């Protein structure tokens, strides 16, 4: 019998199951997406290195992660690029892309609400968090930060599903908005699909991550059409990989299925 504590009901794929302290938080006008003064760079190296060391143990022994296809990202060392992923782990989604892309440094597009989390919110910028902006001037500096990191041949991580659904074993549909970047900056795209399998011992599943790509934006299509096609290519690939999920540790059901 399914454990009711592990059934979650949703109205739409934009429902939030993980709430930050302030979901309406916006980045201030003086926010710095790129911090390259000596102190900030030193702090970033230290915090990122500690996160990697912590992640080795947490992902290997806590989440039981196995990565397949990691070598496909090797080519990104010469170009930089984008890595799209499904959003299903609160801590793992911070660490797993770093392992997949290593030794390439990652910078992750995040909701500004994450910056409102006590303690962690102050650390996130030094881990490479790039919060989205709500103003025109903020969006300009946000995209300039992405362009700057790509010029350094870094990896930009994007979770197009946008909302964290812990242990979700299927791919939620997502818009093409974030898929305009690869064509605009002429960079390759990859995808990272997290899947779940039952372990012989223990309640929580084993995680298998599949890395696929590169996917190239169609140069003959307009910006929107190219973004739609790239989105479809990556979405279909992720859905195919998600079929390797054989265990639903948390089951997600639409509200119509909920019976009092």
Where are the regions that the model predicts?
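Structural motif corresponding to alpha-helix initiation and N-cap regions
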Residues: 67-70, 117, 140-143
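Non-catalytic C-terminal accessory region of glycerolipid acyltransferases
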Residues: 1-25, 142-260
